[in-house]
Amino acid sequence: MDIIKGIDAAQLKKDIIDFNTGDTIKVHVRIKEGTRERIQVFEGIVIKRQGGGIAETFTVRRISYGVGVERTFPVHSPKIEKIEIVKHGKVRRARIFYLRDRIGKAAFKIKERKNFK
């Protein structure tokens, strides 16, 4: 069991910023197309963060051309170049799936957290 923990510890990223559910973030993802590699930015609201250790994931939701798009990322994935926080949101739930039912501008309405560290 200690061997598995040692391998997992070697794979963990050290430079992960602290973000929570309700925050608006930009995820810079490395995408390989044939021989070329480029970085694509996916900006949206974090609706879920789950798991722990190497298996920790988060889901980001955004509206693209009137259609809701959700993407789940592993936190410690080598394909994630960096994560930027655009806005800190104030929510009272760990999973804010109620945003899926909202249409238009209401899909983005989350109060901003003023006193954050």
Curated annotation (Swiss-Prot):
Give the transmembrane region(s).
none
Which GO cellular component terms, listed alphabetically, does the Swiss-Prot or TrEMBL entry include?
A: cytosolic large ribosomal subunit
* Pfam families from the UniProt entry: Ribosomal_L19 (PF01245)
Q: Care to name a GO molecular-function term for this sequence? A: structural constituent of ribosome
Q: Which UniProt keywords apply?
A: Ribonucleoprotein, Ribosomal protein
Gene Ontology biological process: translation
The answer to whether UniProt assigns keyword Cell division to this entry is no
Family membership, please give it. Belongs to the bacterial ribosomal protein bL19 family.
Q: What is the annotated role of this protein in its UniProt record?
A: This protein is located at the 30S-50S ribosomal subunit interface and may play a role in the structure and function of the aminoacyl-tRNA binding site.
Q: What is this protein called?
A: Large ribosomal subunit protein bL19
Source organism of the structure:
Alkaliphilus metalliredigens (strain QYMF)
This chain is encoded by the gene named: rplS
